UniProtKB/Swiss-Prot annotation:
PROSITE patterns (alphabetical): PROFILIN
Coiled-coil intervals: none
Principal location class: cytoplasm
An annotated Gene Ontology molecular function: actin monomer binding
Task performed by this protein: Binds to actin and affects the structure of the cytoskeleton. At high concentrations, profilin prevents the polymerization of actin, whereas it enhances it at low concentrations. By binding to PIP2, it inhibits the formation of IP3 and DG.
Keyword terms, alphabetized: Actin-binding, Allergen, Cytoplasm, Cytoskeleton
UniProt-recorded name of the protein: Profilin-2
Family: Belongs to the profilin family.
SUPFAM superfamilies referenced in this protein's UniProt entry, alphabetically: Profilin (actin-binding protein)
Pfam families given in the database record: Profilin (PF00235)
Length: 131
């Protein structure tokens, strides 16, 4: 299966009538493996900040999480494994695997828990597969 198929079929899938606004799979080095048409252009320093927070949990909390120039308030995640961010009625979930970052961006009416489930389920599967 191509990385694009993982984005299209597993991240942008419909769940209870809702779906993510945007999604991507990005390597730890910031290289985009696959993304939805709506995923924002990320800056290298944004990926560096995210990777730093996985290595030193809490480092993004004071400044916020930036993705495509949009600032998200960092909320409770799983240190070293999942970063969650909130902006108004929407937000972002980022799951770290061995080689990649699985990123899902959502907005109302999708609930944060639905985004978490979609992103973390694919992330867990890819971890099991060695990615």
């Amino acid at each position: 299966m191509s990385w694009q198929a993982y984005v299209d079929d597993h991240l942008m899938c419909e769940i209870e009538g809702n779906h993510l606004s945007a999604a991507a799979i990005i390597g730890h080095d910031g290289v985009v493996w696959a993304q939805s048409a709506t995923f924002p252009q990320v800056k290298p320093e944004e990926i560096t900040g995210i990777m730093n927070d996985f290595n030193e949990p809490g480092s993004l909390a004071p400044t916020g999480l930036y993705l495509g120039g949009t600032k998200y308030m960092v909320i409770q995640g799983e240190p070293g494994a999942v970063i969650r961010g909130k902006k108004g009625p929407g937000g972002v979930t980022i799951k770290k695997t061995t080689m990649a970052l699985i990123i899902g961006i959502y907005d109302e009416p999708m609930a944060p828990g639905q985004c978490n489930m979609i992103v973390e389920r694919l992330g867990d599967y890819l971890l099991e597969q060695g990615f």
